[in-house]
Amino acid sequence: MTTIIAFIFVFGLIVFFHELGHFLFAKRAGIMVKDFSIGFGPKIFAYRKKETQYTIRLLPIGGYVRMAGEDGEEIELKPGYRVGLELTPEETVSKIIVNGKDQYVNAQPIEVSLCDLEKELFIEGYEDYDDTKKVRYQVERDALVIDGKIETMITPYDRSFNAKSLGNRAMTIFAGPLFNFILAILIFTALAFVQGGVPSTDNTLGNVLPDGAAAEAGLKKGDEVLSINGKETKSWTDIVQNVSENPGKTLDFKIERDGKTQDIDVKPATQKENGKDVGKIGVETPMDSSFTAKITNGFTQTWNWIVQIFTILGNMFTGGFSLDMLNGPVGIYTSTQQVVQYGFMTVLNWTAVLSINLGIVNLLPLPALDGGRLMFFLYELVRGKPIDPKKEGIIHFAGFALLMVLMILVTWNDIQRAFF
């Protein structure tokens, strides 16, 4: 049960931040957001505020922000349509009832002759279906079209995705992965404050364990290690490497303590790691507890992970691709099951790493991903005009289909690794 809760928390938080990025930048650009959904499948919770419906759905493995004009939907009232109009006191249209007119007793019946619900925002027709009573009404920018139980807000063209500048459209799409990186930065920064600092690369000693070789030799926390066996040590990595390579051998530590230099002999204990003898002296990594180190940790950790993930991706394509290199939801669930055993802080760290992964994967220039859409914007920038929407739609559909096939293969591979 703990794993399930952790899995929902991890995926939910990552997806929420990703979609929040799209949502906030869409709002900033003046784009109408029709749906903000976390998860897929049947609705568990739904809430409408103004033009946007917010939903939480059963399967917490994704989400979406549906922006006006993005999927090519269009409300069209052809000449001859008979509809009902609810009017404001100013004689402007607030509701257009296509079906279910009997539930709106005050609706004005009209047979449509001409209608524009995108640019000029008007509806023209014959009142009471009488061709001698031609009328024309302005339509409110937030007017609703009622089709039975379905209510759809009209989309003035200037509120649609495609009406916005190339820069605004690109930033709205890029904001999803960007917010994944922001989430990672926030988590890594918070962890640095909670844990009291961040691992330091200095050549000083951290906590000295009471029963270790360092304690027996007289080393103390804060000692600066100048050299080991005459070999200069400039960083914590140098200390670890020298100790690890000399199990059971006495080492001459030249240290500085309270401004004075002294030599201390230390004999590392021998431990097995991956079938190999390594030296250990019982000293923890030094911690930098300065405010600057804590506040910058989020940025440095996130950047280091981005570099590492891109390196892995590069190796995948240059060294041969295998499905075993990928994890789907089942694989991530299995990994989360292992991470949970180490406590909440480790789960948070895992969340940050996954968020960076999702951000990078979404930026890959593949159809149906944010990176694929950004490539189309680059094409538009170079060419001076966008690609035909129908052609772009076909490419995205094909890309989505291929991604679904890959997801099925990866999930099946995850199941085999987990249960067989």
UniProtKB/Swiss-Prot annotation:
Subcellular localization(s) per the UniProt record: Cell membrane
Broad class of where this protein is predominantly found: membrane
SUPFAM superfamilies: PDZ domain-like
CDD domains listed in its UniProt record: cpPDZ_EcRseP-like, S2P-M50_PDZ_RseP-like
Provenance organism: Listeria monocytogenes serovar 1/2a (strain ATCC BAA-679 / EGD-e)
Binding residues for Zn(2+): H18, H22
Membrane-spanning parts: 172-194, 304-326, 347-369, 393-412
Name of this chain's protein: Putative zinc metalloprotease Lmo1318
